[in-house]
Amino acid sequence: MKKQDISVKTVVAIGIGAAVFVILGRFVVIPTGFPNTNIETSYAFLALISAIFGPFAGLMTGLVGHAIKDFTTYGSAWWSWVICSGIIGCLYGWIGLKLNLSSGLFSRKSMIYFNIGQIIANIICWALIAPTLDILIYNEPANKVYTQGVISAVLNIISVGIIGTILLKAYASSQIKKGSLRKE
């Protein structure tokens, strides 16, 4: 098996991605009225970074970005959700491997594939894993954390489904389409 190094491009993407994740997570959220649960624009951006740079970049951007956001907002990290931000970034990256965005294509079929994948990933992460980790790590009440998890999953599905799809389409549209250049 060939050893695969992490490129400078990926490291830079993780750093910039984490910084933008923090800014969006701190300043571009819409409160829902349910405690510690907001409409987050940062996950739509995480989907973009993950789809472009892959699962590892998504994992690290989610982990680092969410940890820094929590430390700068609350003074400490809520590790169960930080872990899930990394997992969701990794899952978005795996979904993105099949999208072929760099060739300038993001067809209706690709949009459907992306959205089915992100719906499944968000349900797994936010409605199942995050609340379960809250119970195991912090001994939180199950009814509270599963309610938060389901609400977060639904809100992230909507945010990523709308904003994330727009970002992916805009990125793909900015790429040179395969076969569009001809030698004269």
Swiss-Prot record:
* Predominant cellular place of this UniProt entry's protein: membrane
Compartment annotation: Cell membrane
What is the topology of this protein in the membrane according to its UniProt annotation?
Multi-pass membrane protein
Any Pfam family from its record, for instance, is: ECF-ribofla_trS
Q: Does the keyword Signal apply?
A: no
Q: Which domain of life is it from?
A: Bacteria
Swiss-Prot/TrEMBL keywords: Cell membrane, Membrane, Transmembrane, Transmembrane helix
Q: Which Gene Ontology terms of cellular component type are present?
A: plasma membrane
What cystine linkages occur within this chain?
none
Return the Gene3D superfamilies for the record. 1.10.1760.20
State the InterPro entries in the record. ECF_substrate-spec-like, UPF0397
Record field: transmembrane: 11-31, 44-64, 77-97, 111-131, 148-168
So what family is this one in?
Belongs to the UPF0397 family.
The identity of this protein, by name, is UPF0397 protein SaurJH9_2709
Q: Organism source for this protein?
A: Staphylococcus aureus (strain JH9)
> Source organism lineage?
Bacteria, Bacillati, Bacillota, Bacilli, Bacillales
